[in-house]
Amino acid sequence: MNFKNVKVPKGPGGGVIAAVVIGGLSLYGATHTLYNVDGGHRAIVFNRLVGIKDKVYPEGTHLMIPWFERPIIYDVRAKPYLVESTSGSRDLQMVKIGLRVLTRPMADQLPEVYRSLGENYRERVLPSIIHETLKAVVAQYNASQLITQRESVSREIRKILTLRAANFHIALDDVSITGLTFGKEFTAAIEGKQVAAQEAERAKFIVEKAEQDKRSAVIRAEGEAKSAQLIGQAIANNQAFLTLRKIEAAREIAQTISRSANKVYLSSNDLLLNLQAMDLDVKPKK
């Protein structure tokens, strides 16, 4: 059999396969030559030939060379970082201090941050510099001063931390002390001091109240003496005053008896006060 004259027919799916291959390559190129940088982020590019490029790419869509380049995206928004550290104060009291810092990478220094620290720069840098700073600052204050001068302590910690973090191209937006915990002995001493202060305030209040009561008693006695003097003068000058007092007393007795549950029988003429014998026509003494 002569195979030279045999013709192999072309497959009907050859064009479809070529189209699929071209489409796949196009899709691969489109997805691997474009990348997006979201809001609050920045990107740097690693090139297989030159390494990390010095350019920092802002938010938006950017081009890159497939396989030769890949983007490294950083979140440049401030994030909180919490640390707790136990340090000794100047008076040798052990203090557990909690610190909260807001940090972010310096956007224009991202290539250097990646070269020296990588992507997990926070875990590499912040624990060490925060612990060291806390120990240095707490050692300058007594335990009581850490409470009374808390704002000054926080300001000193922020000043030192800002300088230390800047050496690693990290910016600190805020530093705050979240908690102070002292040893049992110091805590007991503080509570005892507070109780003593409260007792002193209570004793002071009692003394002041006694003085006030004393002054009130003196004023009341003076008022009663003056009242007795005026009553005596009124009786001496006009007997009608005594008659008025008897009538008022009779009225009070009548009201009391009327409200009483017991049955009492009195003369309606004088209520046992000898009102009938009163001389109501009293002339003032001359």
From Swiss-Prot:
Expression sites by tissue: Mostly expressed in proliferative tissues, including vasculature, shoot and root apical tissues.
Subunit relationships: Component of a prohibitin multimeric complex in mitochondrial membranes.
Function comment: Prohibitin probably acts as a holdase/unfoldase for the stabilization of newly synthesized mitochondrial proteins.
Name of the protein described by the UniProt record: Prohibitin-6, mitochondrial
Chief location bin: mitochondrion
Biological source species: Arabidopsis thaliana
Keywords: Membrane, Mitochondrion, Mitochondrion inner membrane, Signal-anchor, Transmembrane, Transmembrane helix
GO cellular component entries: mitochondrial inner membrane; mitochondrion; plant-type vacuole
Subcellular location: Mitochondrion inner membrane
Residues in the Mitochondrial matrix compartment per record: 1-12
Stretches that traverse the bilayer: 13-35
